[in-house]
């Protein structure tokens, strides 16, 4: 059974991924720009998509752009940022109603592709720079976005763990950049960053919906003019050397302690034992039937929440938990016990089957939405590999208990980070 009908084609420096499906009443256009993560560029790149969404050459005023979106039957457009290991990804999303369901015959798909191309390739400029008013306004918003991470202690403690684990790596950088670097960005500098990104980034466009592939490809050729580029090879930059575990404790005015523990897995998305790592994580802390949830949260009542997740491009496994400050030692100890139990193979065939079923359902739920489907496929484009969804699911299904234990042998404790409250914290 084939879950996805993905047609790939090259258009200059852009790879198009047309996913024909009758599942959705809308068509999703998802444009991605991927580049190395660097301290020098990350804050500018975080600002860039939000400035681009303010106006285009044809619609230089934001209000005019919004009313044009309304004319296209309420087409919506948004942007966000993610990290894939040591790479930074800018995503633009445009969702349009499928013209097949409209009474009149407006060529909405072509207009949507034209608008997306215009947002990315024909921005509103002042000379050789972005419009200074838009840059100033979006700089303020970006600072608020960065500050929001510091105000949300769950996200902040995760950031601090990564900063400590990956001190000398680009991965330590936050996806939105550094708050201290925002003020210095000029409209001219931002335009230089933009020009470099358009010329050098890996560009991928996903078109998901009930569409005609030939029509989409000719519209891409017409509107998305990009030059061919050489993409850098993807290096597995996970460390295989022996890790020296460390403990870092911060103190702030928080009521609930945040205990985050980071491990090095030495396994990334393209590795053969990645499916075994996924099952390992599912058994350890990925789901509500996992060891962390049952033993740390339910049985010992030590945590408000306890879960784990893997970073599939950097080779990390991270435990997140919220605990009473007084329970720090006990929580660290019981999490270590659960981790050791995993390494010892202290789980049944029934546990494995249950975990595989949950992973399978999770994947099928993900690809049941246009955005989830494009994200799943983009994991592969970013990693420069091709694994059909049916193969991905079969690889999970074929994982044995021995495979899980073997994957566990590679995992090493790296950093224990604790954010604890000051005395009398509210």
Swiss-Prot record:
Q: Which GO terms describe its molecular function?
A: metal ion binding
Listed A to Z, the keywords are: Metal-binding, Zinc
Q: Which Pfam families match?
A: Peptidase_M16_C
Q: Which domain of life is it from?
A: Bacteria
Q: Where does this protein hold Zn(2+)? A: 50, 138
Entry keyword Metal-binding? yes
Instruction: Fetch the SUPFAM superfamilies from UniProt.
Output: LuxS/MPP-like metallohydrolase
Membership in a protein family: Belongs to the peptidase M16 family.
Query: What is the protein name given in its UniProt record?
Result: Probable inactive metalloprotease YmfF
Q: What is the lineage of its organism?
A: Bacteria, Bacillati, Bacillota, Bacilli, Bacillales
Gene name?
A: ymfF
